Curated annotation (Swiss-Prot):
Protein name stated in the entry: Peptide methionine sulfoxide reductase B2, chloroplastic
Subcellular location: Plastid, Chloroplast
Occurrences of domain MsrB (ranges): 77-198
Cofactor note: Binds 1 zinc ion per subunit.
InterPro entries: Met_Sox_Rdtase_MsrB, Met_Sox_Rdtase_MsrB_dom, Mss4-like_sf
UniProt keyword Transmembrane present: no
Organism of origin: Arabidopsis thaliana
Outcome when changing C134 to S/T: Increases activity 2-fold. Abolishes reduction by thioredoxin h
Length: 202
């Protein structure tokens, strides 16, 4: 195939110009897409999604909390007796109850996370705590997977325990008419909890 050289000052027909333009387009490579444009094309077919993270405060540091049950903490009762105070052991391990109105966290409504006093597992967010007037800390919901519910042998109440170590927290009551999203009251012993403020004082 022969090609004519276009020179200035010469008049060409529309057919000749069209032919030359077609040949030029066939041999000129289009510019490569920039990296940012390639990324846009790659991900534009489906929306981006990111896994949601739950965060809590545990031992002065932020920890992620998923929806699955926490890792089990198994200790012999002799070891629990050695690391807990006598009153903590009586309530957490022997399912006792503190006197109403005497608990450290009954009237505390600061922002933060309530963890198990035995093993440190995050249990409740402060945003779920409310004043029920019952004399014990009250929450309308626990963190996902953190609380185990077990009916008492008499069937009249439902015990709540730490899902990680089995420490006794208290009982949960439903249908009492409190204006909460769940209509539940987790009645928890203060001594079963350890509160970590969201913004601890330096």
């Amino acid at each position: 195939m022969a090609f004519n050289i276009i020179t200035p000052g010469r008049v060409y027909s529309a057919t000749s110009l069209t032919f030359v333009s077609t040949i030029k387009a066939a041999f000129v490579k289009p510019p490569l897409a920039s990296p940012s444009r390639r990324n846009l094309l790659r991900f534009s077919s489906s929306p981006l999604s990111f896994p949601s993270l739950r965060r809590g405060f545990h031992g002065g540091r932020i920890v992620a909390m998923g929806s699955s049950a926490p890792e089990s903490v198994n200790k012999p009762e002799e070891e629990w007796r050695a690391i807990l105070s006598p009153e903590q052991f009586r309530i957490l391990r022997q399912k006792g109850t503190e006197y109403p109105g005497t608990g450290e966290y009954n009237k505390v409504f600061d922002d933060g996370i309530y963890c198990c006093a035995g093993c440190g597992t995050p249990l409740y967010k402060s945003t779920t705590k409310f004043d029920s007037g019952c004399g014990w800390p009250a929450f309308f919901d626990g963190l996902p997977g953190a609380i185990t519910r077990t009916p008492d042998p008499d069937g009249r109440r439902i015990e709540i325990t730490c899902a990680a170590c089995g420490g006794h927290l208290g009982h949960v009551f439903k249908g009492e008419g409190f204006p909460t999203p769940t209509d539940e009251r987790h009645c928890v012993n203060s001594i079963s909890l350890k509160f970590t403020p969201e913004n601890p004082t330096l």
